[in-house]
């Protein structure tokens, strides 16, 4: 019996942590503010475990069948938690209600497990030996789950299937327990019947995960979903309405094919026109290849290095028929080298010097993205530039996130760069901002590529003029130790979205 229960501890601790990770990941995907979501969920989950541990004192008789019933309950609720959350988001206005109800319920049930196990085993071992073994196995199981969740389960199986898999593991513990633990025959029959019912539901859920995911995402997106993919880093959704293609990453719109040219022409061409002879170009982010498409319109460019973290994005936009048509197969051009790694780390290790650097990172909605807009990042980037090099970075909206925009501009300027703020109206986004910078005052050539849809000499002058409601405001410099930009961004966009 001891061995069976020790193995159970290893499994159930893994399951408990995975349910917590699933809730935090889904909440951060759907609501943003990763740090806030994980902090609230972890705190609520741990508090609920404490409540469960306290409630365990009221379980006095038949502890072994009660332990197995707890496992069945956790398997059922935890296994379906991802599906419930995805389906709730599109149907319930206050998504936080089902989110925290599930976290509290799972936390209480998980909190019951270890105290009940300790009481079952108390006659088998000395107390100090019992506690050390059970708790050490509990922590080992949590470690295994924390390693395998981001590396294997989330990217390979997706969040919904991962939930069902661990629910099945919980039920497996209960079913196995009916064979290896001492139970009355009547209890064995009841528990096995319950286990089979719950197991069947979880297997059906696992089998229909794609259908559940499709239905839940259909309720979130008004247009037809033509591609849905979970990667190690993000959820990719591509939608289509007539001839319009839209890309969403973690629920956030990245571009619409109807007007993306306004964004990408403004991101790329001012920088290349600000350099006398741009030959080597570095693109950080921009795995969709749309910025690279614009770069290749400058015939004097000899090489383009694209560094994007997620290989799934660059592969999709290299191979998918509709998507590679959008970027005119730019990622397959012989001038282009694609590198899939962390941009910050790559810059630290590289010794190359570039004429133009274009930065198309996601908005600084969390601290892991916010670090890419800090003085530390731009200082590292500056080592990959010479006195004639220029950089341009997308800088969120100067209208909706005014302090965020000027925080990025001031951070770059604090490192000795001459900066030129730019903005453009993109119908699918609204007013959007960029910062162009170099170690010399910015001066433009006038030899525009011929096939641009939006940018010309007149528009280049126009996008440099900021109206009063987007003009400069006093802001902090964004550093690694203060992450002021993330605070500005959260405050401003939450105000708009509420």
From Swiss-Prot:
SUPFAM superfamilies: S-adenosyl-L-methionine-dependent methyltransferases. CDD domains: AdoMet_MTases (cd02440). Pathway: Amine and polyamine biosynthesis; spermidine biosynthesis; spermidine from putrescine: step 1/1. The keyword Plastid does not apply. InterPro entries: PABS, PABS_CS, SAM-dependent_MTases_sf, Spermi_synthase. S-methyl-5'-thioadenosine binds at residues 234, 308, 342-343. Residues 196-446 are annotated as: Spermidine synthase. Its EC number is 2.5.1.16. It is a multi-pass membrane protein. It is found in: Cell membrane. GO terms for cellular component: plasma membrane. Residues 200-439 form the PABS domain. Belongs to the spermidine/spermine synthase family. Homodimer or homotetramer. This is Polyamine aminopropyltransferase.
């Amino acid at each position: 019996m001891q061995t069976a229960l020790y193995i159970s501890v290893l499994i159930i601790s893994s399951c408990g942590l995975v349910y917590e990770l699933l809730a935090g990941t889904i909440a951060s995907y759907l609501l943003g503010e990763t740090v806030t979501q994980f902090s609230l969920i972890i705190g609520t989950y741990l508090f609920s475990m404490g409540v469960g541990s306290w409630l365990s004192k009221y379980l006095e008789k038949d502890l072994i069948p009660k332990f197995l019933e707890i496992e069945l309950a956790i398997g059922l609720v935890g296994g379906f938690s991802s599906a419930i959350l995805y389906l709730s988001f599109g149907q319930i206005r206050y998504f936080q209600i089902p989110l925290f109800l599930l976290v509290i319920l799972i936390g209480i049930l998980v909190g019951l497990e270890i105290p009940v196990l300790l009481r079952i085993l108390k006659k088998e071992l000395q107390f100090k030996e019992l506690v050390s073994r059970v708790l050490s196995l509990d922590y080992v199981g949590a470690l295994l789950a924390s390693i395998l969740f981001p590396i294997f389960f989330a990217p390979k199986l997706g969040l919904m299937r991962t939930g069902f898999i661990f629910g099945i593991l919980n039920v497996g513990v209960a079913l196995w327990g009916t064979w290896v633990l001492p139970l009355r025959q009547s209890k064995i029959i009841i528990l096995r019947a319950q286990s089979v019912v719950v197991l069947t539901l979880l297997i059906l859920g696992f089998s229909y995960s794609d259908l559940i995911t499709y239905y839940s995402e259909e309720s979130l997106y008004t247009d037809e979903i033509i591609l849905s993919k979970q990667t190690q880093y993000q959820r990719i959704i591509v939608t289509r309405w007539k001839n319009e293609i839209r890309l969403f990453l973690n629920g956030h719109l990245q571009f619409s094919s109807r007007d993306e040219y306004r964004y990408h022409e403004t991101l790329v061409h001012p920088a290349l026109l600000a350099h006398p002879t741009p030959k080597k170009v570095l693109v950080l982010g921009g795995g969709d290849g749309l910025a690279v498409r614009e770069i290749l319109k400058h015939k004097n460019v000899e090489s383009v290095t694209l560094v994007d973290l997620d290989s799934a994005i660059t592969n999709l936009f290299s191979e998918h028929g509709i998507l590679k048509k959008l970027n005119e197969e730019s990622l397959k051009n012989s001038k282009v080298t694609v590198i899939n790694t962390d941009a910050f780390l790559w810059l630290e290790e590289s010794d190359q010097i570039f004429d133009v650097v274009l930065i198309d990172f996601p908005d600084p909605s969390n601290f892991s993205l916010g670090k890419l807009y800090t003085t530390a990042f731009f200082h590292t980037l500056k080592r990959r530039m010479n006195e004639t090099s220029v950089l341009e970075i997308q800088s969120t909206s100067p209208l909706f996130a005014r302090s965020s925009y000027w925080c990025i501009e001031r951070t770059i300027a604090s490192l000795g760069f001459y900066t030129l703020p730019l903005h453009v109206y993109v119908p699918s986004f609204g007013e959007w901002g960029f910062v162009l910078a170099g170690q010399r005052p910015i001066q433009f050539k006038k030899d525009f590529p011929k096939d641009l849809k939006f940018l010309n000499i007149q528009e280049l002058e126009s996008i440099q003029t900021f109206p009063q409601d987007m003009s400069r405001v006093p802001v902090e410099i964004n550093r690694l130790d203060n992450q002021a930009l993330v605070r500005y961004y959260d405050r401003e966009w939450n105000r708009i979205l509420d």
